[in-house]
C-alpha cells in the first residue's frame, strides 16, 4: 500500500514537472530564408537565403558560411542516394557545386554547356557509383533563364517541340562531361528536334534490374513537318542505350520500327511508351515493360493511353506498377485515372475508387514503412450540380485508404475528440460513407512514425472543400481513425518517432489570438501545450532536423508580420530543442507496446508490428538516427487476398477471377501450348507472400485461338441504348452513349471503358456542336446545361434562362465555339397554354450568360459565319412564328436584333443551310411551295426550275447538298404515301436556276431521297429511279426501282455494271452485258436505319459497299447480297450472300461486316482492302447486332458493336469493342519526297483508258502493302492532278431549259424557243453584250482545256440599242496603233533608202540587174557594208524573179484544167457556196455528238467559226441570236428582231442521212429535226461510259 502511495506521489510530481516543461527556443533574424535541408543521420543543416548559403553543425543553433561555398546559390538538394554526406548546390548561372563531407568543403563540377543558352539543368547521381553523374539541360529558344513562363519539363511524351533537352554524362566525378548523341539523329530544315533525355538504368539501391551499372537509357525525339497545317507532323522517337558513357550508342532493336514517345526507369521495371500512329500526336500509345532491362513485352491495359502525362509513375511494395494517367485538354483541364498492374507488370486494371470515377486529378501514394497501406486523393465532378452564378467547376474531392495493397478501399473515418465541441461537423461522422475525412489534396502523409499520422482536411461528403473549413487531424492507428487536433490548419513535424509533435498555425489569429505561437505534444497528440512567441510571424516552414524523425530538434522559418511602411518584412529563424523533456528520461522496455499494422490483419501472408512508446509514458525513446524496426509474424491460412488473378483473368464484381479473353491468348500457358486451348489456374500467389497453407486452385480450360491479333472488350447495359455518337476529332475516340433508363455513359476509348455521367439529375437531350468537334451540350431536366469543350474530359455547368425547354436544337456559330442560341418557352404553364411562346436567347461566352435575342423565333442561323463571302459577318437569319396567326416570317439582323431588324421574306414554311447556300421554302398559292436561295445573305432570289417543271405543283422539295458549288435539289412530282418520287435538279453556281438531271428519283414519306454523293471522289453519285413512274403515278403499280450512277456530277447516268459472277463463282440469271435488263441495284438512303450510315468512307478512296441484287429491278433486302467496289463504283463484286452492315477503318485497310437483322456470334472482316474475308467468333450467346460504328473519319482500328441480347427484346443491350491494333506489326512507311516508293501507290479512277474525270487525270495515294496500317498518314495531301485533259462530251451538261434527249444531245424543253437578245438584255438593262447559247454548259468541276467546245464560247454580240457601247468596248483604239505603225514605217523607209542608195543607185540602177554579166567585179564594194548591201539586193532580186516565174506557170496550168473540166461536166450544175455550207456540212449535225468525241470536236470548231446556223422556215428570216442561260424562261420574244436578209423558203429535210439522189437545198435544217428523225444506235451503257 505504501509503495502504491509513493508511486502515485511520484507520478503526480513528475506530471507537475512535465507540465512546467518548455522546450528551449532560440530566435535569429536574418535575410529571407528560402530553403532548409538536413543531412540524414546528422546534426548538419544547409540553409539557402537571399544573401547566400549557410551551414549549421548543431541542428541550427549556429550558422556560418561553408568552406569554399559558391556565391549566388539559388537551390541546394541532399543527394537522395547518399543522404548522409552528399549535397548538390546550383547557382543562378546554372553552375553545379558538390559536397561529399556534409558541407564542410565544396567543389565545382565541370559545366557541360553554356548556361546562358539553357533555361534549366538538373543533375542525377548514380545510386551505386559515386563518380557517375548525368546532367539534363532544357533549351527553349524563346525563353530566357528565370523566365516566368510555365513549362512542363517532365512531359516529354507530348511531342511539343518548343523546348529541347540534351544529356551529358560523367564517370570521373564531374571533372568533365560528354554529350550523349543519338545514333539515328538526322536533322533537317523541317524538323522540330526535341533532343535527347537519358536516365541511369539503376534507379536506386533497391533496384532489382540485373542490367549493368554502367547502362544508360536515352530517348531521342523529333517531329517532321510536311505541310503548312497543324496535323501533318510525323513524329519520330528512338530508344537507345550506351554502356560506355556516350562513346557509342545502340538503338534498342525491339523498337527500331516503332515510334517511341517516352520511357521511365523504376526499381523493378523499365517502361517504354510507343505511339500507335506516328502521324497523330494525340495517337493511342502502347506500353512495353521489361523486368531485366533488355527484353520488353507489351502490356495489356483496360483503356487506351492517349496524350497522357504519366508523371508520378511508381511501384508499390509488391513491385506492381502504379500508373496515374493525366489527360490534358485544350483548355488546360485534366482528367485522370489510376491503373495498377499485376506483379508481372504486364496486365493492368483500373483502380475503382469512386462511384463516378471521372476524376480531374488523382494521387496514389504507397507507404514505405506501413506495409500494405496506400492513400488515394481524388478529385471528380461534383455529384450534385450546383451553380453559384459564375462559370466555375465544382469538384468532388474524396480521400481513400487501403491496408491490403489496394484490394479494398475505405473512407477515412473520423471519431469524436473529447477536447472539441460536438457541433464541429455538419454531418454524422458515424455514417462514414457520407461523412468522412477528405485530406488536403496532395498532402503527403509522414510515415517515419509507428502509425502516428497527421494531415489537413475537411469533414463531409466531399462536395464542399474550402480553405475556410480546413482543420488539422491526427491518427494513432495508421489512418484507420482520425480525430481533430486543431480546428484550423497547422504546419506540423514529428520527433522522437512521433512521441514529440510540434504544430504551428499558418496564421497567428487562427486561434483568435493575434500573437504567434506554436503547440507541442509529448503524448502522441493526446494533449497539446502552447508556446507563445514574442512577435507575430507567418511560418513558411516547420521541419525536424532529422529526416527520419528520430531527433528532438525542430526549425521554424518565418516572416515577421510587424513592420513600418519603409522597412521590408523581416525574417525570423527559430530553433526548438526538446532534449530536456521529461528531465532527459529514457524509456525502458516496459514503456513500449506492440502496435500492429492494418489492425492486426494479415498483409501479404504476415502480420506486421512496430514497438512504440505507450502514449502516456513520461519518457522519450531518444534513439537518435535509428530507424523503426518491423516485426513479422507469418500467417498460417492463405486467403483470396494472398492471391492475384493470373494473366488473362480479372476479378468480377464478386471478386472472382474470370477469364478476360482479350489478353488470355498471350498468357504463358497459351503461348507454350501451341493448341487451341490450355489449362490455366485463375489465381496465382502474390510474389513475396508468406502464408503457409496455400489454397487449392483448379485450372480452367480456356480458349487460346481468340485474341492473338484481334482484341474484344464487352460491356453490358441493363437498359436499351437509344443514342450514341463519337466526337469527330483526332485527339481520342470519345463517344457518348445515352440509355433509356440508366442515364448517360462516356467512353474515351471506343467503348472499352465506359463510365456513367451522373450529375444528380436526368439528362433529357444531348447536342453536339456541328462546327467545333470537341464541344457537346447535355441538357438536365432541372434547366442546367452541362457544357464540355474537351470531349467530356470535364464539364462546365451553365444555368439556362428561366423558361420551359422546348426541345428545339441549339444553333451554333460556325467560327466561335462560345456563341450559340438556345430556345426557351415563356409564359408556358404547359405546352398548350395560349400565352406560351418561344424566345431565342444568345450566349457569347459559352453559356456563362444569356441575353434575349428575339421573341417567337423558332429557328435562327448565324448566316454571316456560314457564307464564303457574306454581306456581313454578323448577319443572323431567324424564322419567326407569330403565335396567333401561325404565320412564319424570315427576318435578318446584323446587330442581334437590337436596332437592325429586317423582314427578308414575309411568309415562309421554313429554311435550311447547305453550308454554301441558304434555301427558304415559301408558300405559293394553295398547297404549293417555291424555293428561294441566297449565297451571301444579301438577297434571296427565287430558284428557277426548268420550264417543263414550272407547271408541276411544288408541294415538297428536299435540298440534297452543295459540296461541289451547285445545289442538288429533289422536287417532288408525286407525293402519294408509298408512291413518292420526283425530279433531281442541279443548280448553277449561285443556286438560282436549275437543270433537270433525272425525272423520277425515289424518295420516301419523310422526304429522304435515294441520293448518295460519294465523299472524297469528285462527281460520283448513286441514285435509285422509279422505272415505272407513269404507272406509279396512277397508283396502278408498286415502285420498281433501278439504281443508276454518274461519274460527272449528274451530266451522264448509267445503270450500275453488274459483276460477271457471284461470290460462289456462279453466273447470274441474266445477261450482265445488257444493262437495261441486267444491272446491279442497291438499296439506298431511304431505307437506312441510321441516316449517318453511308455506302462509302471519306477516307477510303474509291471503296463502296451496298446491299443489293443483280437483275432488272431492285429486290427486297432479304433477297439481296452484299457488294463491294474498289474503284468508285465502276466495277463491283459480290462479297457475301445476304444483307450485312459494314464499317470502314484505317482508310479502308480494315473492313468489318456483321449480319443484318439476324442472330449471330461472329463478325467478318478484311485486312487487305476487301480482297479476302475472315470471321471472328464473339464469345458467349448469339446476339442481334443493331449497328457497327467507329470514329467519323474511319481512320481508327477499333470498332464498336451495339448488340441486344437474344433473350431480352429491347430491354438489355451490350457493346463489343473490336480492336485490330495488334493485327498489324508495323505502321506503313511514307516518304514525303517519294510517297509511292514503299508501302503506298498512286491509283487513278476513271471510266476509260484515259482515266480522265472532270477534265483531268487525278491520282490518289493508297496503301499497297497489306502487312501494315495507315493510321492518320496525310494521304489526302498527296492527292494530285497529273494533267488536264482535252474537253469531251463528258465535261458538259445541259444548260438551263435544255434536257438531254435519248441520243445524249441537249435539246430545248418541248414548246420553248431559244431566248433572243431581248430576253436577256431586257432583264439586265446594264448589259452591253451577250453570248449565243448552244444548250450546253461546262460542268463546274471540270478543268479540261481545248478539245470539244459545246458551251457557247463564241464571240460576244451587242444588245439591241447598245451597238455604240459595244463598239467602244471592243473597238480598236487608233492613236496608239497609228503611232506604232508610223515609227515602224519610218524605220523601214530609212533602211530601204540606205539599201537603194548603196546597192542599187550607185551600181547603175535597177536596169543593171537585168543584164547578163560575166562576173560581178564591176559592183562597187569598198568595204564589208557594201558587200552586205549588195548581197541583200541580189537575194531580193532572185526571190522576186522566182515568184514571178512560178505565178506565170500556175496561171497557165489552172487555165488548162478549167477548160478540160468544163468540157467534161458542162451539163452538171453545182451548189452555191451557201447551199454547200448549210446542207452538206450541217445535215444531221447532232449525229456528230452521239458517242463520238472526235465528231463533237469538229462540231465545236464549226460552232466557233460560224456563230448561227439555224433558220426559221416560217418567216424566212434569221431568228434573234440565242442567249446563254438566264433565270427567266426562254419564251418567244414579243420584241421585233433586227431585220436580216431573207432567203428562199425550202421544204424540210425528210431524211437524216443524205444520199446521191437527194435534192440540194439552200436552206439550213430545222430546229428539232433530231428528235423526230434521228435514231440513236448507242445504248445507255455507252452513254454512261463517256
From Swiss-Prot:
Q: Which residues form the signal peptide?
A: 1-18
Could you state one GO cellular component term attached to this entry? membrane
Transmembrane ranges, per UniProt, are: 1375-1395
Residues in compartment: Cytoplasmic: 1396-1586
Q: Which residues are glycosylated?
A: 990, 1284
- Which residue intervals are annotated with compositional bias (Low complexity) in the record? 1546-1565
Print the keywords alphabetically: Glycoprotein, Golgi apparatus, Membrane, Protein transport, Receptor, Repeat, Signal, Transmembrane, Transmembrane helix, Transport
BP GO annotations: Golgi to endosome transport; Golgi to vacuole transport; protein targeting to vacuole
Q: What is its main location?
A: Golgi
By its UniProt entry, which SUPFAM superfamilies does this protein fall under? Answer: Oligoxyloglucan reducing end-specific cellobiohydrolase (SSF110296)
Function, as annotated, reads: Functions as a sorting receptor in the Golgi compartment required for the intracellular sorting and delivery of soluble vacuolar proteins, like carboxypeptidase Y (CPY) and proteinase A. Executes multiple rounds of sorting by cycling between the late Golgi and a prevacuolar endosome-like compartment.
- UniProt family annotation: Belongs to the VPS10-related sortilin family.
Q: What is this protein called?
A: Vacuolar protein sorting/targeting protein 10
Q: Which organism is it from?
A: Zygosaccharomyces rouxii (strain ATCC 2623 / CBS 732 / NBRC 1130 / NCYC 568 / NRRL Y-229)
Which lineage is the organism of this entry classified under, starting from the top rank? Eukaryota, Fungi, Dikarya, Ascomycota, Saccharomycotina
